[in-house]
Amino acid sequence: MTSDETGLPPRYEIRTLVGPEHAKWACALVTHCSIFASPVFSKVHTTTSTQSRTQLCYAMFRTALYQMSHQVDSGLSLGIFDTEYQFKRHVSAETGGKLYWDLENDASTSTRSEQFEDQLLLEQMDFPLVSVALAYDSFCPLDPTKLQPLYDLFPLIPLRNKATDKRDHRNPAEWQATGPGEVLFRGGTATKAGEEGKGFMKKLSWYMMRKAAADWRFRGIQIGTVHDAVSSVWSRPPAPFTAEVVVRFKCKDDDDDEELRKCFEGSDQEVTMIYVTLKAPN
């Protein structure tokens, strides 16, 4: 994919994510971004004397890998790769990249500063993938039983989903897929720490919209967001696409759900559900 087609500097390329290694890299990016930078996860999940940020990252990685793998295996997830990336280890250069997290080590690292943990985990992400946009065909849904370990670890996720569904007053027959290749579900985005501010998320999102319409032939994309920048990009798609903010609320303001408010305590983030129309209905 050329830089002229993507709007990226020449050293960066958009590629389809493939295989278990890309799934691991994507999972590491999303996990690291969530625990250290997310306006939700980094705020509401504080560490204790027995639970460090590193331990949270490892736990989230292990429980979220199924979701990431499902999306990568769909062939509908994209990533931005740095073609001039300088590998930190010879082994990484030989294999094209490698994740060095010690996922089997659950020993507490709470005596280390969060900044130290952040940088150590980042240094161990020795691969050229710098940004991801994960997605899957909504007609081939995720298995709820395989998501349960992630939900048990982060109960705010199913609570947020339930609150979003409660506020979605659309007629399902008007938008839901009745077969494969109709509605794409977006399921995660992240940019590697140190690569922010380059417009990767917007360029990758808009590229996915165009590819989903022209090549994959989807009629719509739905995305749930818990980040203002992501919400802004997806609610203002490039022509000829149009977007509808189907749901918008702040969990801390939900007077009817004390459990939801408690889970999001510490975060003032707005939650949105956005549907992008790629093609007019027949």
Q: What is each residue range found by the language model?
A:
Residues G224-P281:
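Accessory, usually C-terminal, subdomains that scaffold auxiliary metal cofactors
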Residues Q86-K192, V246-S267:
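Conserved acyl-donor/pantetheine-binding loop and adjacent beta-alpha core of acyl/acetyltransferases
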Residues M1-A28, H32-P39, V44, T95-R112:
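Conserved N-terminal entry element of GNAT/NAT acetyltransferase domains
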Residues V40-S77, F81-L120, L260-R261:
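Active-site rim helix/loop that mediates acceptor-substrate recognition in acyltransferases
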Residues R186-A212:
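Conserved acetyl-CoA-binding loop-helix of GNAT-fold acetyltransferases
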Residues T83, S138, T189-T191, I223-V230:
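An acidic- and aromatic-residue-enriched active-site/binding cleft used to recognize and process polar
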Residues E182-F185, A212-H227:
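Conserved GNAT acetyl-CoA-binding A-motif
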